[in-house]
Amino acid sequence: DFSRFIIAWELCTTMAAGDVQSTLNKAITFTGVDRVKVKHRPRLLSDNGPCYVSNQLAEYMESREMKHVRGAPYHPMTQGKIERYHRTMKNIVKLQHYYFPWELEQELSKFVEHYNHHRYHESLKNVTPADVFYGRQRKILSARDRIKRKTMEERRRLNLRNPLISKVDTIVQI
């Protein structure tokens, strides 16, 4: 949630608890959280759709020692980040016609790759979700600050050599 990185996704023909479990299994495998001892177990934030309130999913979550948090009914803002992702994805994906499920799946795969690794997010200080997820954000922002400082120093140095600008600067200082 904090990085907006899409860990796992699946194109399903149904909205069943088994589909949710399958996607969660992919996420667990990707992160490796099932192979190491973690301080904070992952949690699932979802709406109140039938697949999320089923006993089957509750048992699955309990067996994985994962917490399930549901948003307030009729309050999609609780899941605002993923709702925004879905809107962005639909705006891109709906531009094409897909005649076979594999075509749609291929396009979704390309979109997730772009979203995670190439699309800068203003809310993430203009880095990608992958940069945040893999812990590169601080280093990137520090490098940007360093470049900005050097650029400003260089501009100042060059402007002081320019007779027109240095006279204006002198007049302003008086």
What are these regions (language model features)?
Residues 1-114:
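RNase H-like DDE/DDD metal-dependent nuclease/strand-transfer catalytic core used by mobile genetic elements
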Residues 40, 62-66, 87-174:
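C-terminal domain-tail junction helix/linker
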